[in-house]
Amino acid sequence: MSVTVSSPAGRSFHISRSPYKKISKPRVIIAAVRSGVSLAVAPILTKLQKDCATPLPVLRHVADAMAVDMRAGLAVDGGSDLKMILSYIDTLPTGNEKGLFYALDLGGTNFRVLRVQLGGKEERVIATEFEQVSIPQELMFATSEELFDFIASELGKFSQSEGGKFEMQQGRTREIGFTFSFPVKQTSVKSGILIKWTKGFAVSGTAGKDVVACLNEAMERQGLGMQVSALVNDTVATLAGARYWDNDVMVAVILGTGTNACYVERVDAIPKLPQRMSNSPETIVNTEWGAFSNGLPLTEFDREMDAESINPGEQIFEKTISGMYLGEIVRRVLVKMAKVGGLFGGGYVPEKLVTPFVLRTPDICAMQQDTSRDLEAVESVLYDIAGVKSDLSARKTVVDICDTIANRGGRLAGAGIVGILQKMEEDSKGVIFGKRTVVAMDGGLYEHYPQYREYLQEAVTELLGSEISKNVVIEHSKDGSGIGAALLAAANSKYEHDY
């Protein structure tokens, strides 16, 4: 079987790097001063709202197409835009797990180590504790051994501070759930080959190697009695963390800087799965849904942004619904309105505003929360970001733009969720819509943008109808991926039959 690349979804609401090629900055255009700014801008806003519209037929098409692409991706590798990657996670936490387990979350310039003491059905999570460690910049360009030795050393220091409610059973090896948020070919529940480093890392001697082996060997060199029992991505860990508390969780979605979704799939519904690879009736499938593109309502601003990105024609769903891009789409609309419609008065394009990514999604979220009479928060953001003073008419237009882009993003995300649920329901009537089904959500975009959340829920309700949608619970699972990795270490422990 050919193995497919898995890549992480961003949970953070902070945009740390631009996904754009280096392009020359547009020249600042001085236009004639217009009277009646709102009239000049109105046609641009009207067209934007029309192009971004997501009425029920559009949502239904997106949901149906998502389900079709899922099936094609499950049939054969490369069968659709959706990679439908096998997680090799066949054993999910049940609540019976007991003991002390660790998690390591490596996904950027910081990594996090966590431990959890589990007490079985009665006590569940007795205690948790974590630390965040910054990776020295020189180690981002060091050798594989140097980087993993540093990580193992910090793990060792953290493990030495055990005490109080944390107790390791005598004679046991400490087991770790390893969340590795870089492109990797997963080959088993505890092995995966690194494709390449991203996010500013250029570590030598790791590409093509098993990252679990690299970490295990480093821990051995440090003399630690620790080993990895589960390698997971953040979306899968989120599902596991939520499932531990609620057995009705069937889907997990991350909506942050990036986005992804995974779900519990029947093994007999995966034609590309090698025979006898799993003894379990179910496994978790990582959809990599950011690559979906079928029937999405796109604007001239989306197409322009995509063409200038480092991956044109790719990750179109992600570019319409995730935190990395919403602010950038709004910025591009504002540039056109300033250029063509004299939005900010004086008929000029603010120099700061022509810089890609200068307007972030947290900025448009903040503007949309402004309920003051004069939209003072909007005025402040525009002045700080664009360096211009705005009148009330311009501020109202900006809020309308933010709402239009957030509305489309939230509703398309909701349609994607329904597409996943729809596919599962078609395979087994009643298994999803005939009972309570939970979708666990994580990520800063979902957590911190209330209008986006509302639009997502609205779309789900519209598509499913009021009766069926009562059975579908969409709930926030804050930081579920951290504890989820430790829980997967417990669920896949070599000591699993000891409790």
Swiss-Prot record:
Expressed in vascular starch sheath, xylem parenchyma, guard cells and root tips. It is found in: Plastid, Chloroplast stroma. GO terms for biological process: glucose 6-phosphate metabolic process; glucose metabolic process; glycolytic process; intracellular glucose homeostasis. It is an enzyme of class 2 (transferase). It holds the Pfam family Hexokinase_1. Its EC number is 2.7.1.1. The keyword Cell membrane does not apply. Residues 39-490 form the Hexokinase domain. Pathway: Carbohydrate metabolism; hexose metabolism; Carbohydrate degradation; glycolysis; D-glyceraldehyde 3-phosphate and glycerone phosphate from D-glucose: step 1/4. Belongs to the hexokinase family. PANTHER family: HEXOKINASE (PTHR19443), HEXOKINASE-LIKE 1 PROTEIN-RELATED (PTHR19443:SF63). This is Hexokinase-2, chloroplastic. It comes from Nicotiana tabacum. The gene is HXK2.
